[in-house]
Amino acid sequence: MDSAFLKLDAAEFLEIWQRFDADDNGYIEGKELDEFFCHLLKKLGTNAITADKVQGVKDRFMSAYDITADGRLQIQELANMILPEDENFLLLFRRETPLDNSVEFMRIWRKFDEDSSGFISAVELRNFLQDLFLQHKKHITGDKLDEYTDTMMKLFNRNKDGRLDLNDLAKILALQENFLLQFKMDASSQEERKSDFETIFAHYDVSKTGALEGPEVDGFVKDMMELVKPSISGVDLDKFRQILLNHCDVNKDGKIQKSELALCLGLKANP
């Protein structure tokens, strides 16, 4: 779609998003989606808008832009649909491959939570965006950077406290489903549990050192805790991380060896 005809900037995009994501759940879906496409037809100057016309344009655009094929529009999908490319700051977060590992997510989190407060402040978010623009070799004025920072805060800061938490950043980066959800440890035999453990450890041991350290521990803790508490804060994560290290890090080297984690879980790991 040639979205330039709408001549939108980031602030106007925010206004459209907030208007049609009426229930503030992070998606435009159902009746909201129909109302959005009706609005789009009016913007295009379409006369005599009918339900069939709305359905037709909806089918056409959803097949092109609903990347996740879930019948609803996420923020990034809507931005791709209606923002001109030079205004689509969300393109900065587009990745060659989906972010499907919490280890990489936590590496990003630790980098930009500069003061280790458990939150990303507006200043830290501004630095985050500036860093992304530099990575993409794009020049941006200070005023434009401020505008994008403000828009990002309003789009993703769900509780309106002026700072982003883990869940806000997960939405921005489109973090994939929790890796641990596929495992049902309680219903498994001992052999199945050992096999699952090997798969799980290999997933989080991104560096392949035989030990979890730094963001590898963070990623494991995040996914493990979110099995029982779907939305944890950065502060909660740091607490749970320290509890896990106190319990499992027998040799106190700040890492969790494969054998140490197996012992904590009542298993014997393969060498």
Swiss-Prot record:
Binding-site positions, Ca(2+) 1: D21, D23, N25, Y27, E32
Compartmental location: Cytoplasm
Biological processes annotated in GO: regulation of long-term synaptic potentiation; regulation of presynaptic cytosolic calcium ion concentration
Domain EF-hand, residue spans: 8-43, 53-88, 100-135, 144-179, 192-227, 235-271
Gene3D superfamilies: EF-hand
Alphabetical keyword list: Calcium, Cytoplasm, Metal-binding, Repeat
One Pfam match: EF-hand_7
Gene Ontology cellular component terms for the protein in this record: cytosol; dendrite; nucleus; synapse; terminal bouton
Positions annotated to bind Ca(2+) 2: D113, D115, S117, E124
CDD domains in UniProt: EFh_HEF_SCGN
Chain positions recorded as Ca(2+) 5 binding sites: D249, N251, D253, K255, E260
Annotated InterPro entries: Calbindin_Ca-bind, EF-hand-dom_pair, EF_Hand_1_Ca_BS, EF_hand_dom, EFh_SCGN
GO molecular function: calcium ion binding
Binding residue positions for Ca(2+) 3: N159, D161, R163, D168
Residues binding Ca(2+) 4, per UniProt: D205, S207, T209, E216
Protein name: Secretagogin
